[in-house]
């Protein structure tokens, strides 16, 4: 249902359980227009893909705060459309898991200068990067508790044959009570083999923009081979090490520098691993006599205050060879987490593998636009049904 509002801002499918608002709340400076039953608390920031502010329902006590992310100019940029569609589909698919951020509402506003896709999500006070890099003292129990939650969320994601592809502390939100929630599914990808076979397609190579460099697995830096869930496991290993270092452990300025930052700690990879990567870049890494040969530095030397179990888990996650890394089920069962683990509260996604075959049909801007509008309509229809 399209609603013409008093400020001539048109919105698609305003939540029916709240009623169609007769006016809009305007934040002119940031070109934000939201339904009149919200009031804006504050502007939170602006990034590459949108503007974020916090809002609350008018006249409600206690006032639950909501984060609103506006993605501007979305219908004119293919990359924004693709990211938005992916994120909406994945967040809807994974809704309900306590360690994955919850999408509350969606709205498409078409009236300039407020036009864009508006995503309403639960507002969470911090991201994990702020926690790790703060002066707050973290005990090993805290680290176990945080890591366990990350792995619970990742287990749910991986059980649907989905790779997040951009796990990092900045994409893990943290409530005041210490509850972690994985967010930002704009780069996530379904990898179930059956769907590739159905459409006679092959698994694509990972794109250059996927995975923030500091958390990027070696195979993403050196190989053109299809990637697997192990790229997320590498990122988890980087995050675990970062808990102890209180800063990222591999901080490369570019892709090649990133490789050498990893080499300085893990040592120069064996030739069979370099051959397995299957690229000239990887082969030259071992062939070039100007490159110094590094020996592996024991993680226990880097983090002498960490427990034996923590060191063992870091070593088991950060392997040059992706096939030697633990999978998420093995990681969550590691003795390091015995103190905090609740095996009966580690659900998997019962909807089965995520079907990503829709992507092959979205081969034009017009199809992408129409698909996004349809996704928003479907979300709001489901939202209205669930509120009855």
UniProtKB/Swiss-Prot annotation:
The keyword Transmembrane helix does not apply. Keywords: ATP-binding, Cell shape, Cell wall biogenesis/degradation, Kinase, Nucleotide-binding, Phosphoprotein, Serine/threonine-protein kinase, Sporulation, Transferase. The keyword rRNA processing does not apply. Its EC number is 2.7.11.24. Its cofactor is Mg(2+). A motif (TXY) lies at residues 207-209. PROSITE patterns: PROTEIN_KINASE_ATP (PS00107), PROTEIN_KINASE_DOM (PS50011), PROTEIN_KINASE_ST (PS00108). The active site is at 166 (proton acceptor). Activated by tyrosine and threonine phosphorylation. It catalyses: L-seryl-[protein] + ATP = O-phospho-L-seryl-[protein] + ADP + H(+); L-threonyl-[protein] + ATP = O-phospho-L-threonyl-[protein] + ADP + H(+). Interacts with GSC2. Belongs to the protein kinase superfamily. CMGC Ser/Thr protein kinase family. MAP kinase subfamily. Required for spore wall assembly. Required for proper deposition of the two outer layers of the spore wall, the chitosan and dityrosine layers. Negatively regulates GSC2, an alternate catalytic subunit of the 1,3-beta-glucan synthase (GS). Participates in a developmentally regulated signal transduction pathway that coordinates cytodifferentiation events with the transcriptional program. This is Sporulation-specific mitogen-activated protein kinase SMK1.
